[in-house]
């Protein structure tokens, strides 16, 4: 074998010739090699070994020198090339050839090319350059506008190489802008990427924690904070403030002044870092000592769902900063009312609403059109901190928008009496005209009632408030003017309008559908609606059709929607440009919901269940159609499909969905959204919604109910049914209820209401994990300010009683022994004591925990129990109960016969 190999390698140029192999044939052959060295030995005998001849060429250094000297090759320094491309990109980011920008760029170029500049100096120079360019970029955008800046940029590309590079950069930039949906603030976007990189490096994500001051100074970071506050795009501004704030506070050496710190706190709230936000507020509360700072704290507690802390801080604020009108910022009022209504605490919501009404009666409101005229066009500048504090402490007058939002909250949470009172009081506000009343009706969608009598009926529901006749008269005139404007007297609308307010507020989707239908369809503006709005209209149409029993017509509509999806995939130009919108998971969810309701109706009426198989087959067919249409299930669809399987006691299908869903949630925990470099907003962090979590807990509760060991003596019929269901269960939950609770309450950022909390407690009781319930109750009351009322307390005590009886039944030989054991247990005055009505929260919690501890001790048949599993549950949830040790000691003193 002969090997011929010649290669040339250098730092800038690599050239490698082909390797050619020559094998001498062993058979006799009249052949002469073209290689001089083997002319005299062309044939190798059979017994002779192969020989390898390596041909020597010029060295790599000789060839490299020859190419550089004679062939006009040029040696390239890779670092210089990267630096040159970087300068070209910065020039592209300048957008236009402004003299000041060019001057800044030339200064930076000199610094980067200087041999005396090390990496730190270069990074420092780049950061300074970007800060100045961002400031200029924002000012240009505010003065010249986006289109003019772009046109000037295109007109100034004289240099061919720069023009080509700009096309490359612009192509990448356009893809980024399409994804982000931002105005092209190129230097600003680049600065945010650098800030993101700094966060990754200096906040312990990539490397161990270091100091940011190794790269940039505090002065530069302070300047960066001022620059990002001016960004006109809200999302970019919030992210910029978040990133710079993390770097400043990450050093542990500096703290912003209260006003600037409030900007950083707001960004922490936006990106879900509630603990850090509250910590900054509470550590500066006494030092700042201003009402506006307390209002900021109130917003933090509300947005982080710490309603108990909200109540405490509100009481403190009222006592410390009392005003003539019991003033509370409209922003705080709106959010607090919405939060309390969402957990079903109507009493607290009504108290806050009454407070809002009194404020409006004293100071009036700002009309929407007037408010728009007075909105500031830019950032407000102050002469000093004193003027800024005075501005922040000014009483904010509520607007029409604030008032109508609160009416909406009460309407759609079915607190009709308070909503009616608000509507009536609105008519009494000085300066209210018929046009203003009509505006309220349209915004609350009350104009979609069939006639005014349906609206008049809501005023009769509030017996504590008598509506003046003048208010009703003005409202009626406004109602009639709206009907005339939208022509809803037409027969086509008559069958579609709502019979009463309850029907109006029952389905927001349906209400939105009718609103869009009335305002757009009649004017011929259907195709001007965006794809989401049209999709919602069809969703509402499906809802109406299925609700009225028109199943076949609903399937015809679904078929059209599926056809629209197929057409848009074949021809992308048709996407969102067809009369029928593309099918999505919401459309399929309506059908599944319809079949679930059918099964529930069959159970309620005790009708034969032979149609269950038919419904299950239809749902299976829907899933197949979804797969064929490549529609990805969303949280709404998953909730409905789980509801359907749950109503069928089909736990196999239920946990086929739940198990992988919870596993993916654990992998993409919302704690990762607290990343300092790439933060996520609320709705992006929460991949499982509150209704879906509620349904998952419902399935768990029913599952453990079926798995409970029923008494051999009691509930024989129930035991037979459970055994039949139990035999069919092949797939079981992989996520423990304790883990599910942590995912729901902590990582899921869910605020459970009373019904949800009762479901959680019920699940733990049915699963037999009574050791966790003391920690669960403590967590719910401490974080979510849940009111453990008399009904919930009795529910827990009755559940404990059932546990006692079930265990007694299982250890009894016959019914006679069971009765004796039951009588002995029930006569024991130490257990299952009722809680007197009116007992305060602390005593109620203590009583319930004590009863649970007694049951655990009774079940363990121990004279002195350590209750380690109870304490472990408290540690798992990161909460504590100060009286736990005292209760344990008290319970261990009791003598309870097992």
Curated annotation (Swiss-Prot):
Source species, domain of life: Eukaryota
GO biological process, alphabetically ordered: mitochondrial ribosome assembly; mitochondrial translation
A cellular-component GO term for this protein: mitochondrion
Keyword Mitochondrion: yes
Chain segment of the transit peptide: 1-31
Subcellular location field: Mitochondrion
UniProt-recorded Gene Ontology molecular function terms: translation activator activity
Chief site of localization: mitochondrion
Keyword field contains ATP-binding: no
Keywords recorded for this protein, A-Z: Mitochondrion, Transit peptide
Miscellaneous comment: Present with 396 molecules/cell in log phase SD medium.
Protein name: Protein SOV1, mitochondrial
Native source species: Saccharomyces cerevisiae (strain ATCC 204508 / S288c)
């Amino acid at each position: 074998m002969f090997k011929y190999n010649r290669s040339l390698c250098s730092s800038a140029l690599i050239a490698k010739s082909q390797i050619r192999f020559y094998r001498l044939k062993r058979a006799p052959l009249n052949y002469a090699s073209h290689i001089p060295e083997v002319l005299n030995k062309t044939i190798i005998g059979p017994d002779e070994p192969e020989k390898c001849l390596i041909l020597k060429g010029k060295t790599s250094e000789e060839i490299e020198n020859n190419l550089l000297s004679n062939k006009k090759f040029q040696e390239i320094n890779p670092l210089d090339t990267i630096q040159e491309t970087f300068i070209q990109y910065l020039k592209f980011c300048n957008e236009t050839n402004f003299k000041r920008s060019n001057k800044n760029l030339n200064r930076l170029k000199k610094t980067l090319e200087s041999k005396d500049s090390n990496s730190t100096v270069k990074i420092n120079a780049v950061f300074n350059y970007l800060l100045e360019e961002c400031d200029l970029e924002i000012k240009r955008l505010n003065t010249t506008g986006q289109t003019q800046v772009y046109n000037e940029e295109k007109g100034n590309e004289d240099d061919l190489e720069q023009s080509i590079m700009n096309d490359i950069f612009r192509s990448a930039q356009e893809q980024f802008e399409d994804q982000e949906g931002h105005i092209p603030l190129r230097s600003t976007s680049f600065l945010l990427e650098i800030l993101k990189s700094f966060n990754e490096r200096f906040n312990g994500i990539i490397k161990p924690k270091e100091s940011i001051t190794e790269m940039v100074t505090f002065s530069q970071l302070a300047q960066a904070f001022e620059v990002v506050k001016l960004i006109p795009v809200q999302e970019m501004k919030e992210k910029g403030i978040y990133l710079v704030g993390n770097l400043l506070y990450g050093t542990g050496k500096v703290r912003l002044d209260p006003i600037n710190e409030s900007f950083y706190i707001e960004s922490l709230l936006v990106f879900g870092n509630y603990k850090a936000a509250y910590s900054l507020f509470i550590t500066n509360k006494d030092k700042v000592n201003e009402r506006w700072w307390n209002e900021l704290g109130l917003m933090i507690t509300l947005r982080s769902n710490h309603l108990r802390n909200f109540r405490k801080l509100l009481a403190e604020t009222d006592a410390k900063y009392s005003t003539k009108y019991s003033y509370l910022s409209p922003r705080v009022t709106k959010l607090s009312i919405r939060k309390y209504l969402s957990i079903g605490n109507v009493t607290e919501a009504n108290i806050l609403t009454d407070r809002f009404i009194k404020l409006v009666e004293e100071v009036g409101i700002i009309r929407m059109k007037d408010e728009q005229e007075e909105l500031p066009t830019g950032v407000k500048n102050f002469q000093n901190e004193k003027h800024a504090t005075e501005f922040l402490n000014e009483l904010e007058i509520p607007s029409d928008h604030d008032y109508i939002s609160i009416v909406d909250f009460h309407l759609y949470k079915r607190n009709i009496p308070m909503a009616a009172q608000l509507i009536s009081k609105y008519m009494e506000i000085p300066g209210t005209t018929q046009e203003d009343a009509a505006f309220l009706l349209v915004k609350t969608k009350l104009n979609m009632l069939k006639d005014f009598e349906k609206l008049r009926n809501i005023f009769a529901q509030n017996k504590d408030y008598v509506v003046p006749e003048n208010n009703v008269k003005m409202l009626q005139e406004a109602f009639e003017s709206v009907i005339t404007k939208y022509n809803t007297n037409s027969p086509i609308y008559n069958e579609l309008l709502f019979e009463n307010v309850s029907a109006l507020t029952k389905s927001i989707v349906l209400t939105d559908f009718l609103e869009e239908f009335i305002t757009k369809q009649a004017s011929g503006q259907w195709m001007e609606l965006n794809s989401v709005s049209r999709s919602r209209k069809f969703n509402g149409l499906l809802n109406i059709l299925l609700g009225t029993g028109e199943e076949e017509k609903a399937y015809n509509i679904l078929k059209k929607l599926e056809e629209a999806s197929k057409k848009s995939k074949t021809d992308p130009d048709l996407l969102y440009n067809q009369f029928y919108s593309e099918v999505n998971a919401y459309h399929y969810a309506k059908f599944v919901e319809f079949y679930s309701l059918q099964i529930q109706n069959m159970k309620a009426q005790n009708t034969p269940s032979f149609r269950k198989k038919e419904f299950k087959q239809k749902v299976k067919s829907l899933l197949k159609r979804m797969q064929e249409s490549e529609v990805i299930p969303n949280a709404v669809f998953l909730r409905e499909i789980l509801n359907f399987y749950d109503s069928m006691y089909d736990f196999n299908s239920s946990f086929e969905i739940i198990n992988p869903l919870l596993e993916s949630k654990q992998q993409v925990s919302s704690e990762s959204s607290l990343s300092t470099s790439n933060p996520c907003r609320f709705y992006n962090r929460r991949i499982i919604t509150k209704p879906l979590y509620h349904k998952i807990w419902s399935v768990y509760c029913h599952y453990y109910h079926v798995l409970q060991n029923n008494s051999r003596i009691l509930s024989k019929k129930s035991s037979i049914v459970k055994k039949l269901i139990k035999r069919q269960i092949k797939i079981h939950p992989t996520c423990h209820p304790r883990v599910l609770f942590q995912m729901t309450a902590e990582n899921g950022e869910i605020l459970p209401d009373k019904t949800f909390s009762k479901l959680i407690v019920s699940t733990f009781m049915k699963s037999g994990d009574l050791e966790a319930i003391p920690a669960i109750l403590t967590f719910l009351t401490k974080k979510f300010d849940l009111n453990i009322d008399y009904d919930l307390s009795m529910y827990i005590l009755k559940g404990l009683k059932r546990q006692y009886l079930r265990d007694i039944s299982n250890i009894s030989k016959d019914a006679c022994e069971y009765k004796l054991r039951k009588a002995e247990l029930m006569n024991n005055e130490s257990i299952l004591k009722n809680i007197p009505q009116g007992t305060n929260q602390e005593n109620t919690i203590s009583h319930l925990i004590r009863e649970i501890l007694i049951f655990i001790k009774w079940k363990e048949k121990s004279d002195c129990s350590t209750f380690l599993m109870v304490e472990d549950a408290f540690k798992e949830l990161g909460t504590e109960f100060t009286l736990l040790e005292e209760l344990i000691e008290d319970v261990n003193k009791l003598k309870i016969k097992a």
